[in-house]
């Protein structure tokens, strides 16, 4: 009897570990499609507006979904529900620390600019641990560490 209980407990633990590893590997980042996006308390147009984002391309993380709404969380841990028509696949990130933008994807390349913490960046493409990005004024390469919104 004790052996059956232990086997059952172990198998439940393995299932839980397997599920957690799958869910963390499948993080979904999206970006805001419009310059004004309502975030609601619930997954319905009948739900009250909790707050309004006013930043196009802002990256957000999807943590749940229900029909045509996605529950999201942002870099500052604000959360709520957004309709799918206001979201696009993520092509943007936010620098979580000051970073150097390089001309080529190597630390030995010519530095182009200092990217300040909190800066919104548009990702062109990624190779290994580097992403080619553009800002309002610069194009170049940046290391992928300390970027929020990047899918692995």
Each model region followed by its residue ranges:
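Bacterial N-terminal signal peptides
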Residues: 11-19
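Generic extreme N-terminus detector
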Residues: 5, 16, 29-30
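Second-shell loop/turn segments in exported
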Residues: 44-47
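Bacterial N-terminal signal peptides that target proteins for export
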Residues: 2-11
